[in-house]
């Protein structure tokens, strides 16, 4: 006779396998779509697409299924504030990218991300204060990004570049999500926005097209991340009262409308081929 604990263990194992398979499928698919969009419309559009919560959204969803709605509510608050660390990464990388190679730029970006995450982990910000902080840092980061020219469409150096991007991003997601549960729920939430896609694409774009193109990509990430902030604000406000399905549907719907609006900001600041 199967015990209740055995059923629970089997269900958790199933969820783990489903989550792992989703990582193997969704991450390379998204990287492929974003890379092809950048090839067609320019790197700014690639960065703008990265602003969608394609990594942290599923993390919050599975946390709700595994740990309950209140746990997901608290994690969503931390995830929303964690985007501040992503802005620190983008700004640090961009300030060096126009004069240095991808390696020191990446080191600076990672150092900024980790330092910011460490500071945020020592704070316990109320939801609306965290929301205001995220918006403020978004605006400041966008204003401090280096000014570069309009997007240009560049061919990839090798036919292996796209598969390499997809593999690198997938490996990074598996590594981060494997380590994160070991450091506690608060830090897990703060680490969930880890700039997997931004790091992968910025490095490849920097190597193949130059530092200015990497800056354009990361500017797109910063502006597009307004959607990220809105998504997790709505999720934090609704998931306990409304449940998983209704709260996620509301967050997704409002976020998509927000993301379309944010594209107009990018079109105003930086004209790119095929969209103007």
Where are these regions (language model features)?
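N-terminal signal-anchor module of multipass membrane proteins
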Residues: 4-50
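Structural signature of hydrophobic alpha-helical transmembrane segments
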Residues: 15-27, 49-53, 67-85, 127-137, ...
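C-terminal ends of transmembrane helices
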Residues: 30-43, 87-101, 143-154, 202-213, ...
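Cytoplasmic-side transmembrane-helix entry/capping segments in multi-pass membrane proteins
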Residues: 44-53, 100-111, 128-135, 154-168, ...
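A generic, lipid-embedded transmembrane alpha helix
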Residues: 50-66, 229
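Hydrophobic alpha-helical transmembrane segments in multi-pass integral membrane proteins
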Residues: 63-64, 118-129, 171-182, 228-244
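Membrane-interface helix-loop-helix junctions at boundaries between adjacent transmembrane segments
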Residues: 71-81, 87-132
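Selected transmembrane alpha-helices and immediately adjacent juxtamembrane segments
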Residues: 147-187
